[in-house]
From Swiss-Prot:
Record text on subunit structure and interactions: Monomer.
Pathway assignment: Pyrimidine metabolism; UMP biosynthesis via de novo pathway; orotate from (S)-dihydroorotate (quinone route): step 1/1
Residue positions of the active site: S183
UniProt KW keywords: Cell membrane, Flavoprotein, FMN, Membrane, Oxidoreductase, Pyrimidine biosynthesis
InterPro entries: Aldolase_TIM, DHO_dehydrogenase, Dihydroorotate_DH_1_2, Dihydroorotate_DH_2, Dihydroorotate_DH_cat, Dihydroorotate_DH_CS
GO CC terms of this entry: cytoplasm; plasma membrane
PROSITE patterns: DHODEHASE_1 (PS00911), DHODEHASE_2 (PS00912)
Membrane-topology descriptor: Peripheral membrane protein
Phylogenetic placement of the source organism: Bacteria, Pseudomonadati, Pseudomonadota, Betaproteobacteria, Burkholderiales
Binding site for FMN: A67, G68, L69, D70, K71, T91, N147, N180, K225, T253, G276, G305, Y326, T327
Catalysed reactions listed for this entry: (S)-dihydroorotate + a quinone = orotate + a quinol
Protein's job: Catalyzes the conversion of dihydroorotate to orotate with quinone as electron acceptor.
Location(s) in or outside the cell: Cell membrane
Protein name: Dihydroorotate dehydrogenase (quinone)
Length: 349
């Protein structure tokens, strides 16, 4: 365990000398190699016990991997064995698509932030499902979330068709499914967070889920991932709509379009969503507002800007039942997982 944890700080300067997306791919490849060689397989069992329940699912601990790091579900076991209590992969779209032109990912180290405009680059639903089926994660009793989106060339008026295809495809292979309507990098996608649009989409998804539950004889929870750049009125509208359509969870939040915290830094004016430290306070606001409106009706997963165990605890104190990591892993490495698990285990005593 210590070899892997000490290796990342040593490797980080070399990784940060690379283009951000290239470094991401190199890191995943090396992590997969470490897993295949057995170097990470004890990490999962090295974490303290911090049992939690999320959307009716039993978690070993409430620290999860956020979607986006493994878009194609090709590294589920390697990533999960870093000590996560649950793993979410995707976003996957019905058809393969290349995403936006490169370069499309930028580091802002002084702000512990990233800007990305990846645009749901992925290999498509069939390849995604094949990767998920090869994983041993769920067969070990671990929790896997599958995140679905719409293709860039699907008109927003027909977005529901893509989500329905995605839901039907991933349903048999998921412990929960996340509906991503908050990426800023797919044109007009965030319009689906609006009251009428959201209600119409979720109504269709709930109807399809009921049919799938009957077909597969099991209930798979549905979560919705929302943006941090919402007004109080928009948050309140979402909080009213989610339980009405039987939604089990809400993931708060995706990346922000705000640039206040990174203004003047290199790459700050690049198009795309900001993740990392600048999102922490924004997501806390959304979590607190959601919890005050939802009560216990819908589970909240807190994500955005967690770079320490303390910040994971702040997400939980704001009203989250679980947290997810992504950008913090890039800046802190795999040691962040254990730090967050320990902080939450201590806080639950």
């Amino acid at each position: 365990m210590s070899i892997l944890f000490h290796a990342y700080p040593l490797a980080r300067p070399a990784l940060f000398a690379m283009d951000a997306e290239t470094a991401h791919e190199v890191t995943l490849a090396q992590l997969q190699r470490a897993y295949d060689c057995g170097l990470t397989r004890k990490l999962l069992h090295a974490q303290p016990e911090a049992p939690a329940t999320l959307m009716g699912l039993s978690l070993r601990n409430p620290v999860g991997l956020a979607a986006g790091l493994d878009k194609n579900g090709a590294h589920i076991d390697a990533l999960g064995n870093l000590g996560f209590g649950f793993v979410e992969v995707g976003t996957v779209t019905p058809r393969a698509q290349p995403g936006n032109p490169k370069p499309r990912m930028f580091r802002l180290p002084r702000a512990n932030a990233l800007i990305n405009r990846l645009g749901f680059n992925n290999q498509g639903l069939d390849a995604f499902i094949a990767n998920v089926q090869r994983s041993q994660w769920r067969s070990q009793g671990r929790i896997l979330g599958l995140n679905i989106g719409k293709n860039a060339d699907t008109p927003i008026e027909r977005a529901a068709e893509d989500y329905l295809i995605g839901l039907a495809g991933v349903y048999p292979h998921a412990d929960y499914v996340t509906v991503n309507i908050s990426s800023p990098n797919t044109k007009n996608l965030r319009a689906l967070q609006g009251g009428d649009e959201l209600s119409a989409l979720l109504g269709q998804l709930q109807e399809r889920r009921l049919a799938l539950a009957d077909q597969h004889q099991r209930h798979v929870p549905l979560a919705v991932k929302i943006a941090p750049d919402l007004s109080d009125d928009q948050i309140d509208a979402i909080a009213e709509i989610l339980p009405r359509h039987g939604i089990d969870g809400v993931i708060a939040t995706n990346t922000t379009l705000a640039r206040d915290a990174v203004q003047g830094l290199p790459h700050a004016e690049e198009a795309g969503g900001v993740s990392g430290a600048p999102v922490h306070e924004l997501s806390l606001r959304v979590i607190e507002r959601l919890r005050s409106r939802l009560g216990d009706a819908v589970a909240i997963i807190g994500v955005g800007g967690i770079l320490s165990g303390r910040q994971a605890s702040e997400k939980m104190a704001a009203g989250a039942q679980a947290v997810q990591l992504y950008t913090g892993l890039i800046y802190r490495g795999p040691a962040l997982v254990g730090e967050c698990v320990r902080a939450l285990a201590q806080g639950s005593r």
